[in-house]
């Protein structure tokens, strides 16, 4: 039979493929790529670019399994002494590894593969849901496809660090917030209030920095509901906040029992602010220094303090740096912007870091910016103040998150991996831009064909 017959038959059949089938294929692709990354990282936990923290989580989980609790056998970053309690690392992620090691023995590759499967499926699906909600189903599929093949997400998908689960939890929280902003039914608001509380609780226990965004999230929900003339859902908000407290409180009490002082979640904010704003930099931030350099910053009179006390003392010192020379702090913060949004290759980076950076953020950044600008100029409703309408829209929520989250790190300590949640949130805008570019190109091609035919 004529080969053209098969081609025509295939093209006709392809048009019958549903969006659901396409999405399933995209999700399977995302899972396979992340599982491949997990297998390449293997059963050894070694020093690799951008994922050094996995060594700490692996060691800490082994100590918990062996009955030593959250401690290290040797002096560990930042300056935690052997056998002394640590709260520097996410308890939830450590317990995830502990559960895997308890069930299967010290098999990091199993933790990697399970994580790759869960994150590959959920992060891709949530990206689709958010993009579909803001734009359209087609754009949701494009966004899911971008997320599936995004090199940073593939690389980190198998790394034993909080980032994969954390980014997924952020997307889950943002999507539930979008739903909360539009629901009128009381029972549904209660249902989504509970879901949002669980999502936010998981997110902050993975990385406490997200706590700084939560007030803005609820303010956005209230304003969005007010603009839609819906009740302010105070009961569902109270449920959400209550569930966050339930997630955080056990850790706070545990820290109190170990350190004899209040530690909300983790002992890392003081270290980060102190290290990130030390006069050593002058007005030019350097993202990564040698460990010995960081340790040399810590005053000798503070080195005898336990981890929690030292964290609080260093936060005070860091704030004093700002008060002593606010101009330097402003210039130093500005210098963090290129480091945070770096998309170009660097001779200081490894080959894998350069490939991941350029092939993911470097390729998608122009489309992200294109999509953002297009959305900023787009009218979401025909009446009312344009900026308020934009702010109260799901688009506005993603923009607010990106601005707040970037600002937090620009003002403290900026690393590329700290930007990855923003990448995930901006992917729907890149998908919108890609769709728009193809539509414009198609129109021009059709015009050329029409002109040629006439």
Describe the residue ranges of each PLM region:
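Transmembrane-helix motifs of polytopic, lipid-linked glycan transferases
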Residues: 113-135, 172, 176, 366-373
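Specific aromatic-rich, kink-prone transmembrane helix
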Residues: 129-130, 146, 165-183, 195-196, ...
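Membrane-interface transmembrane helices that cradle and orient dolichyl/undecaprenyl
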Residues: 134-137, 173-193, 221, 227, ...
């Amino acid at each position: 039979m004529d080969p053209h017959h098969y081609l025509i038959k295939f093209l006709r059949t392809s048009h019958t493929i549903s969006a659901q089938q396409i999405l399933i294929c995209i999700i399977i692709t995302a899972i396979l790529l992340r599982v491949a990354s997990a297998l390449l990282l293997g059963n050894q936990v070694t020093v690799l670019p951008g994922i050094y923290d996995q060594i700490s989580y692996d060691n800490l989980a082994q100590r918990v399994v062996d009955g030593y609790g959250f401690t290290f056998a040797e002096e560990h970053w930042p300056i935690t002494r052997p056998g002394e309690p640590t709260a520097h690392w996410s308890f939830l992620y450590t317990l995830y590894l502990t559960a895997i090691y308890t069930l299967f023995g010290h098999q990091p590759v199993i933790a990697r593969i399970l994580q790759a499967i869960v994150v590959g499926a959920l992060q891709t699906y949530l990206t689709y849901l958010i993009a579909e909600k803001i734009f359209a189903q087609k754009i949701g599929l494009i966004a899911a496809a971008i997320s599936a093949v995004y090199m940073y997400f593939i690389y980190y998908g198998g790394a034993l660090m909080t980032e994969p689960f954390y980014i997924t939890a952020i997307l889950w929280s943002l999507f539930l917030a979008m739903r909360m902003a539009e629901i009128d039914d009381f029972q549904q608001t209660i249902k989504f209030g509970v879901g949002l509380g669980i999502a936010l609780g998981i997110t902050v226990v993975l990385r406490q920095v997200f706590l700084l965004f939560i007030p803005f999230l609820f303010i956005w929900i209230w304003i969005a509901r007010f603009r839609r003339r819906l009740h302010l859902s105070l009961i569902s908000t109270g449920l959400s906040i209550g569930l966050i407290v339930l997630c955080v409180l056990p850790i706070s009490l545990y820290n109190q029992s170990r350190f004899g002082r209040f530690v909300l979640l983790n002992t890392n904010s003081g270290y980060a602010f102190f290290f990130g704003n030390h006069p050593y930099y002058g007005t030019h931030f350097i993202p990564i220094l040698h460990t010995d350099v960081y340790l040399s910053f810590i005053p000798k009179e503070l080195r005898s303090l336990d981890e929690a006390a030292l964290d609080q003392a260093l936060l005070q010192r860091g704030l004093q740096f700002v008060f002593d020379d606010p101009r330097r702090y402003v210039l130093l913060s500005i210098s963090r912007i290129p480091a945070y949004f770096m998309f170009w290759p660097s001779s200081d980076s490894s080959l894998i870091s350069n490939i991941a950076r350029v092939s993911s953020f470097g390729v998608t950044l122009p489309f992200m910016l294109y999509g953002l600008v297009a959305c900023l100029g787009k009218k979401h409703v025909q009446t009312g103040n344009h900026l308020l309408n934009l702010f109260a829209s799901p688009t506005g929520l993603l923009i607010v998150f990106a601005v707040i989250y970037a600002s937090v790190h620009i003002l403290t300590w900026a690393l590329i991996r700290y930007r990855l949640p923003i990448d995930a949130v901006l992917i729907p805008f890149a998908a919108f831009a890609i769709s728009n570019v193809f539509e414009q190109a198609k129109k021009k091609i059709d015009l050329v064909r029409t002109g040629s035919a006439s």
